[in-house]
Amino acid sequence: LACSMAVGLMQINSGLNFFFGLPIDGVTVFAIAAIMVTVYVVSCLTGIKKGMRVLSSFCTIVFIGLMVYVLCLGPTRFIVDAGTESLGVFFNRFFEHSVILPTMAENETWSKSWIIMFMASFFVYAPIIGLFLARLGKGRTVREFIFMNIGAPTLFCIVWIAIWGGTTVWLQYTGIMDVWQSVNEKGLEVTIFTILSTLPFAKILAAFFIIAVFFSFSTMADSIT
């Protein structure tokens, strides 16, 4: 929870600095954290059906709206083609990457860079989130539970990664923006906002994105308490 909050604070502060000129310092981070914790406490006190439901619905609408906006005004054809091809490659190499280990290739970085990091996150979140999902599943059929907790989130992630990943690759490929240089010089937390800056009404998009990230932490923290 602390690591997630730290990442969220970095991203929010970086976005406010990139588009609106707010300083990146301890005072700003503390102010953002104080507001974030306040929203989280209010969400917890009002319960799942009120505070958390409202925040979750708002975040869902914003994230879906951002996806549709980028898909329509971004490189639509490239996104569809790259997303379809990438999904095929993912399914084709899923089992290979699931069991890959650097047995004889000491310089192999896939398992070190990705698998171990993911597994550590899963071990931390799985028990707590599992209890939360079980609570939500009370009174629902197995089919409804599987669709809402596995099917719908999986589909959302596929579309989200296809749209944002495709746009990022297209910007790098066409030379419109050097995404990799931005990652190295400014960090991952700023790169999403440099990508947004290439789209029309960038500041409005950034504002909605920052608010959604802000509320997403509150809903995530609420679900594990």
Regions found by a protein language model. Give the residues of each.
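Select transmembrane alpha-helical segments in multipass membrane proteins
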Residues: 1, 30-38, 62-73, 107-113, ...
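Transmembrane-helix bundle segments that line or gate the permeation/cavity pathway
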Residues: 1-18, 29-32, 42, 71-74, ...
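Membrane-helix boundary/coupling elements in multi-pass transport proteins
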Residues: 3-13, 127-149, 203-225
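Extracellular/periplasmic helix-exit of transmembrane alpha-helices
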Residues: 70-93, 154-186
